[in-house]
């Protein structure tokens, strides 16, 4: 609940902000702050609702801990009360993904570098945002923040945007 649904919620809110207050940064920034608040409430609601619904099912046991593979079919889970081992023929990993931070000098020391996750926690709309990466996530964020009123610069290290997608589709998206 930190990526898809919250981002789509903000994309919708950005479209409204662009329609209502196009070229009025202070008003768009205020709508952005409100949208982040609504996104946070939605995320919290979904997380709590999903956890409650799952934990009440008789055939589901929820463990909150750190897991590691012992073998192909066994996972060790470190819990506050001690480690346990869980075994299964098939193991489904659903932890989300970790954003890639490129090897750029000074990037780790900067207090103004955000990932796709941490950017969504900002309560203040950036006046200018530089997005590194021209894949679908970078393009979605560029579009969203531009509609909220930020000046957006998009950088792609490869020879084209959306490098993992069909070139015809990528070219069509670039034209838009």
Task: Name the predicted role of every residue range.
Residues 123-165:
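Rossmann-like NAD(P)H-binding beta-loop-alpha module
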Residues 1-125, 158-162, 168-171, 175-176:
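Glycine-rich flavin
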């Amino acid at each position: 609940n930190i990526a898809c649904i919250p981002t789509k919620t903000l994309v919708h809110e950005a479209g409204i902000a662009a329609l209502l207050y196009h070229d009025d940064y202070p008003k768009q920034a205020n709508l952005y702050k409100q949208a982040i608040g609504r996104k946070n409430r939605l995320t919290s609601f979904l997380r709590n609702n999903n956890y409650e619904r799952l934990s009440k099912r008789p055939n589901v046991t929820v463990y909150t801990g750190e897991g590691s593979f012992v073998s192909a079919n066994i996972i060790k889970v470190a819990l506050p009360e001690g480690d346990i081992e869980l075994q299964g023929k098939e193991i489904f990993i659903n932890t989300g993904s970790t954003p890639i931070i490129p090897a750029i000098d000074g990037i780790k020391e900067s207090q103004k570098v955000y990932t796709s996750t941490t950017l969504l926690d900002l309560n203040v709309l950036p006046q200018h945002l530089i997005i590194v990466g021209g894949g679908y996530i970078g393009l979605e964020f560029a579009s969203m923040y531009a509609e909220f009123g930020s000046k957006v610069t998009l950088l792609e290290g490869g020879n084209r945007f959306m490098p993992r997608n069909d070139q015809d589709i990528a070219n069509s998206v670039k034209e838009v």
